[in-house]
């Protein structure tokens, strides 16, 4: 892993303002303030400084993937080439697919997030994995579309939550839901994904 273009040393800490790059087979786990991050292999991102050295204001993911848990605090953002998410206090997974014109995948694993892509914008409220695609080109007239849960696990979120003395929504409620990307712990009639409400 590299920090600001230099190989990360075992005794080095990651701070806001740093740029991070991981190579093949590398995984990087770190904490900044009340937020924790697991950066996957072949990823490029930066953590931009908020009001203090220990507050992340923007996580900018240029490529690859990151799982993150965010404590309560001032409004923060995750920015990818095709999607922006306004974070309140939540656990999320974000991935940029370079081979698909930087198509971005975003899962609000639990919590409340404002998600936008192009002119499409929704508020996601999830107890259990509500997922989206930020499309590089409109699909059926939309740049924000629904997705299934992919490429991350409950256990990753639980581990990151423990690092910042938190518990996931499903740990608090004592049950797990259906991993269909809709965001609900129980499948009930009439439940809709937020993208189904766009244009209504």
Language-model-derived ranges and their functions:
Residues 1-27, 31-200:
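Flexible, surface-exposed loop/linker segments and immediately adjacent secondary-structure boundaries
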